[in-house]
């Protein structure tokens, strides 16, 4: 059973939330495209923007020169929605968003498959993934109709 993460736009804060898809979604396809995704600039990303990857549903920005702003992907491995690389992932994404790292598509795939997934499976920590909030991303990969409700309205 694969752990699924999805991003949802929080319009109140104009940010994307990266969060696990609820248990009720397991075993069913995530709504939304898994093929080529539309992009604001068709020249910014190749039409097959990484469709060969085993990680499905990566956002368009994952393959742009600016780097991924947030991620929604399906793991090919059996995992629960726990994270022990919770400090590494935001740092990598933030550096990519700032353009500080020129990760290729192959490097990006290797990071998830060999580093993040390995840490999840082997280190055995049980830190629950709540949400990653990464500002500035306008690639709206919403795979659930429900609004992002991680921020209490005060």
Swiss-Prot record:
<keyword id="KW-0805">Transcription regulation</keyword>
<dbReference type="GO" id="GO:0039693">
    <property type="term" value="P:viral DNA genome replication"/>
</dbReference>
<keyword id="KW-0010">Activator</keyword>
<keyword id="KW-1074">Activation of host NF-kappa-B by virus</keyword>
<keyword id="KW-0804">Transcription</keyword>
<keyword id="KW-0053">Apoptosis</keyword>
<dbReference type="GO" id="GO:0085033">
    <property type="term" value="P:symbiont-mediated activation of host NF-kappaB cascade"/>
</dbReference>
<keyword id="KW-1121">Modulation of host cell cycle by virus</keyword>
<dbReference type="GO" id="GO:1990756">
    <property type="term" value="F:ubiquitin-like ligase-substrate adaptor activity"/>
</dbReference>
<dbReference type="GO" id="GO:0039592">
    <property type="term" value="P:symbiont-mediated arrest of host cell cycle during G2/M transition"/>
</dbReference>
<keyword id="KW-1045">Host mitochondrion</keyword>
<comment type="subunit">
    <text>May form homodimer. May interact with host CEBPA, CFLAR, CREB1, DDB1, E4F1, HBXIP, HSPD1/HSP60, NFKBIA, POLR2E and SMAD4. Interacts with host SMC5-SMC6 complex and induces its degradation. Interacts with host TRPC4AP; leading to prevent ubiquitination of TRPC4AP. Interacts with host PLSCR1; this interaction promotes ubiquitination and degradation of HBx and impairs HBx-mediated cell proliferation.</text>
</comment>
<feature type="region of interest" description="Mitochondrial targeting sequence">
    <location>
        <begin position="68"/>
        <end position="117"/>
    </location>
</feature>
<dbReference type="GO" id="GO:0033650">
    <property type="term" value="C:host cell mitochondrion"/>
</dbReference>
<keyword id="KW-0945">Host-virus interaction</keyword>
<comment type="similarity">
    <text>Belongs to the orthohepadnavirus protein X family.</text>
</comment>
<dbReference type="GO" id="GO:0042025">
    <property type="term" value="C:host cell nucleus"/>
</dbReference>
<dbReference type="Pfam" id="PF00739">
    <property type="entry name" value="X"/>
</dbReference>
<protein>
    <recommendedName>
        <fullName>Protein X</fullName>
    </recommendedName>
</protein>
<dbReference type="GO" id="GO:0006351">
    <property type="term" value="P:DNA-templated transcription"/>
</dbReference>
<comment type="function">
    <text>Multifunctional protein that plays a role in silencing host antiviral defenses and promoting viral transcription. Does not seem to be essential for HBV infection. May be directly involved in development of cirrhosis and liver cancer (hepatocellular carcinoma). Most of cytosolic activities involve modulation of cytosolic calcium. The effect on apoptosis is controversial depending on the cell types in which the studies have been conducted. May induce apoptosis by localizing in mitochondria and causing loss of mitochondrial membrane potential.</text>
</comment>
<keyword id="KW-1079">Host G2/M cell cycle arrest by virus</keyword>
<keyword id="KW-1035">Host cytoplasm</keyword>
<keyword id="KW-1048">Host nucleus</keyword>
<dbReference type="InterPro" id="IPR000236">
    <property type="entry name" value="Transactivation_prot_X"/>
</dbReference>
């Amino acid at each position: 059973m694969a752990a699924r993460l999805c991003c949802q736009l929080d319009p109140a804060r104009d940010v994307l939330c990266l969060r696990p898809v609820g248990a009720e979604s397991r075993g069913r396809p995530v709504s939304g495209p898994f093929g080529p995704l539309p992009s604001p600039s068709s020249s910014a990303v190749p039409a097959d923007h990484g469709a060969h990857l085993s990680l499905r549903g990566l956002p368009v920005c994952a393959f742009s020169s600016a780097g991924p702003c947030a991620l929604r992907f399906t793991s090919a491995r059996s995992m629960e929605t726990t994270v022990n690389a919770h400090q590494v992932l935001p740092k990598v994404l933030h550096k990519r968003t700032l353009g500080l790292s020129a990760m290729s598509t192959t490097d990006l795939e290797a990071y998830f498959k060999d580093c993040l997934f390995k840490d999840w499976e082997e280190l055995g920590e049980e830190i629950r993934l709540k949400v990653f909030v990464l500002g500035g991303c306008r690639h709206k990969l919403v795979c659930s109709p429900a609004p992002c409700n991680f921020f209490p309205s005060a």
